[in-house]
Amino acid sequence: IDVLLPCLDAELPLLVNLAPRLAGLGIRSYLPGPEQLAGRAKDRLSDLAREAGVASPETLPITQADFFRDCERKDWPFPLMVKGVFYDARMAANREEAEIAFRAIVAEWGLPVLVQRRITGEECNLAGIGDGTGALLGEVMMKKRATTSRGKAWAGISIHDEELAKTAQRLVAALKWKGPIEIEVMRDSQGVYQLIEINPRFPAWIYLSQGVGRNLPAMLLALALGEAPPALQPPRPGMLFIRYAEE
């Protein structure tokens, strides 16, 4: 193995801790440090957003489904987003749906479970690479046009929005992130980008980066090998993608 590039959120903590041993074996990687990885965790996202000057819906970690019995009296009205600390996000319109989501997420991802205020608006995602010093390289942006039942992008179109780019740059600078990154935001009715999630890897739609003239996996490989990354063209907005699955 020359280079090891993780693709799943749950792989990151293990591989970050193993990075020195991997380097000793001659296996290259391009990974954040433990502090950077922890700083973008879903249960610390609100703190990061405040530090970077980015809006974000309030998020609360919980360990008991009993929270949903009287959450509306605690100023947490439905609908709410119920999320796993590593993965999974489900919209709950009432107590019953919230408790079902809570139990399913605990069974797969463990505790805590996160409850997030639901923001409505236009969903956009940005993928790029942090260089470890605070710079964001090769950003590619897309707007969701169709989603799965879990809210994952099934179809989308490439965009270029300077305000979204600046928002992502502030977040990457605050983290001093190193490696691939996906930033999920919601553009609310006031035109403000609300930070929803930061994922520590490329998204499933990353092939769109090749389609818009910015091959981010190739850039990541070059950086991991210590080579100069390829020159990037300005991204091409208006490129449509549709995901498909074959079993």
Tell me what each language-model feature is:
Residues 1, 68-75:
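Short amphipathic alpha-helix with an adjacent loop that forms part of the alpha/beta core around
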Residues 2-40, 55-58:
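A short, GP-enriched loop/loop-strand-helix hinge that lies immediately N-terminal to
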Residues 14-17, 91-92, 125-127, 207:
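Short glycine-/acidic-enriched loop or helix-start segments at secondary-structure transitions
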Residues 29, 45, 57-61, 112:
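Structured catalytic cores of enzymes that bind and process phosphorylated ligands/cofactors
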Residues 31, 37-43, 91-94, 149-151:
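Short, charged, surface-exposed secondary-structure boundary motifs
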Residues 49, 59, 72-91, 110-121, ...:
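ATP-grasp fold ATP-binding core
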Residues 93-176, 186-194:
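Phosphate-binding site of ATP-dependent enzymes
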Residues 160-247:
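ATP-dependent carboxylate activation and anion-phosphoryl transfer catalytic cores
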